[in-house]
UniProtKB/Swiss-Prot annotation:
SUPFAM superfamilies: ACP-like (SSF47336). Carrier of the growing fatty acid chain in fatty acid biosynthesis. InterPro entries: ACP (IPR003231), ACP-like_sf (IPR036736), PP-bd_ACP (IPR009081), Ppantetheine_attach_site (IPR006162). It is found in: Cytoplasm. This is Acyl carrier protein. The keyword Lipid biosynthesis applies. It comes from the Bacteria. GO terms for cellular component: cytosol; membrane.
Length: 77
């Protein structure tokens, strides 16, 4: 499973959305109807899965699925 697939699977599970709705351009709030609690839980799950901490400042910048994928790729390299 690719990083992109892993991230999308986590988002589907955490937000209860359809896999077809999770695109790199999807906004968590506008397109996937996430609220602040959803986003906090999503960040915690991503931190656990990928074994690094996401600062509050960084988390605020992660607005789309693509933002998260790019952020994790940068942290892993």
């Amino acid at each position: 499973m690719s990083l992109e697939d892993d991230v999308k699977a986590i988002i589907v599970d955490q937000l209860g959305v359809s896999p077809e709705d999770v695109k790199e351009s999807s906004s968590f709030i506008e397109d996937l109807n996430a609220d602040s609690l959803d986003l906090t839980e999503l960040i915690m799950t991503l931190e656990e899965k990928f074994a690094f901490e996401i600062s509050e400042n960084d988390a605020e910048q992660l607005r789309t699925v693509g933002d998260v994928i790019k952020y994790i790729q940068e942290r892993q390299n």
